[in-house]
Amino acid sequence: MDSSLSQKFTLAYASLLGVGGLMGYLKRGSKISLVAGGGSAALFYYVYTELPGNPVLASSIGIVGSAALTGMMGSRYLRTRKVVPAGLVSVVSLVMTGAYLHGLIRSS
């Protein structure tokens, strides 16, 4: 199966979120990080699987999820000034929001 570039970026994004949640749990014992990172990773893995067959649905879900993460982690960055994880996730999420918006426009 040949993956599109958008699928590869989505899979990398899901992996980043999942690994980040796991790291938060392992380093600080944060169950919230584990659940939030795992849940976000699962959502974006679903987007990854839906992109080839239903790009409008997948991109729509991707926009909502990545925009929510941009807002939440951006707010956290402004409050804590910690680049990792809040700054990193907010910037990557902002880029992914734009990518999903581009995909949605292109698919419509």
UniProtKB/Swiss-Prot annotation:
A Pfam family: Tmemb_14
GO cellular component terms given for this protein: membrane; mitochondrion
Membrane-topology annotation of the record: Multi-pass membrane protein
Family: Belongs to the TMEM14 family.
Record Gene3D superfamilies: Transmembrane protein 14-like
Transmembrane residue ranges: 32-52, 55-75, 85-105
Compartments where found: Membrane
Organism listed in the record: Arabidopsis thaliana (Mouse-ear cress)
Recorded superkingdom: Eukaryota
Keyword Transmembrane helix recorded: yes
Other remarks on this protein: For all TMEM14 proteins, 4 hydrophobic alpha-helical domains are predicted. However, NMR structure determination of the human TMEM14A showed that only 3 of these helices are membrane-spaning while the amphiphilic N-terminal helix is probably located at the lipid micelle-water interface.
Disulfide-linked positions: none
Function: May be involved in free fatty acids export.
UniProt keyword annotation of Transmembrane present: yes
Keyword tags: Membrane, Transmembrane, Transmembrane helix
Protein name as it appears in the record: Protein FATTY ACID EXPORT 7
